[in-house]
Amino acid sequence: MPPPASSMGFSDLLNPQNPESTPSTPASKSSAPSTPSTEQSNSNMASSVSLLPPLMKGARPANEEPRQDLPRPYKCPLCDRAFHRLEHQTRHIRTHTGEKPHACQFPGCTKRFSRSDELTRHSRIHNNPNSRRNNKAQHLAAAAAAAAANQDNALASNAASMMPPPSKPITRSAPVSQVGSPDISPPHSFSNYAGHMRSNLGSYARNSDRASSGMDINLLATAASQVERDEHYGFHNGPRGHHIFGSRHHNNNRLPSLSAYAISQNMSRSHSHDEDDMYSHRVKRSRPNSPNSTAPSSPTFSHDSLSPTPDHTPLATPAHSPRLRPLGTSELQLPSIRHLSLHHTPALAPMEPQPEGPNYYSPTQPHVGPSISDIMSKPDGTQRKLPVPQVPKVAVQDLLSPGFTSVSSSASNSVAGGDLADRF
């Protein structure tokens, strides 16, 4: 009796044999028509083959073999791996970059994940009420919230305690200028001007406490502009106002300007009394023409100052000076605001221009020699010549003396104004 077909199929699969080693069958059997028994055995063998691969370990299903041949268009730019789908490539790239876009939404949990399935698996921990981890996370979240609230309250209380007390309003401020503008209502006397200056500068005397630097500078600027306007209107006209010519450049180079003094006071030693002592024996300038002027003579002001300028020399030439032009705005130098005198100054009558001594530049002096019209009216052309100018005889020592360069000899006892007029 021949073996069953199923046993023949398993034996053939487990022990394959070459066709040459198999015994030859009679020709009549191979040429004989197939019987129903052989068809049944072939169908059983096919079914056994189809059921065998899932049972064998390490074998791939037959339907996954074509998938290995599918294209992988999504390649990782950081490594050599390629993927069939874009989301797989994106998920893989996050392993390189460390990006974790999926954050847990549970309050108090700060965990993040790079994959959505990891977030889903993690969220089950919070959703499970019986989980010990869930209870621990809830306790930690509550403790963190309480600590944050306590920290906010502590910061608020510290800020309130460290805040400085409300500052008191500043009662000492720069007084408002009450001197009217010269264009509107200029003062008409020195007493009126001195009264206004006292009201403006009364609290800023030499020994009084000064306000802050900002108010000091503003007050200095206001006083400087006011003094400049008043001097342009001719209020500083003293009996020796015409003596300024010999020391005009000296005052420009030696007197401390108002702006420079304000800047130096603000930036260097604005609250030191040593500077007051240093200036007290060198510069004690009060307002010009003041009867209580304490200004020393200019030879004691600087070592290289040789001008015999008198003590009460004004700082600007009056507009109606007999021989000299008034100083311009750029040449005007003001005294220190702290050394201005606040005493009343008597009103002085305007000084009339009176020539003192010979004045070679006076236009009223008669001409010496023929005039130009007389020379041009002569009939002879050879006589139409200008005469040789008459130069005043001046000694060489006088020309070389510093008097013509705004600094004269300190040994000279002559008055600056008259001496200069004689030299001209």
Swiss-Prot record:
Look up and give the organism this protein is from: Aspergillus fumigatus (strain ATCC MYA-4609 / CBS 101355 / FGSC A1100 / Af293) (Neosartorya fumigata)
Q: What is this protein called?
A: Probable DNA-binding protein creA
State how it assembles: Interacts with creB.
List all disulphide bridges recorded for this chain.
none
What this protein is reported to do is described as: Transcription regulator component of the regulatory network controlling carbon source utilization through ubiquitination and deubiquitination involving creA, creB, creC, creD and acrB. Represses the transcription of the alcR, alcA and aldA genes by binding to a GC-rich region in their promoter. Also plays a role in response to carbon starvation and the control of extracellular proteases activity.
Bias (Low complexity) occurs at 21-38, 288-302, 406-416
**PTM comment for this protein?**
Ubiquitinated. Deubiquitinated by creB, probably to control its activity or amount.
Q: Which gene encodes it?
A: creA
Gene Ontology molecular function terms on file: RNA polymerase II cis-regulatory region sequence-specific DNA binding; zinc ion binding
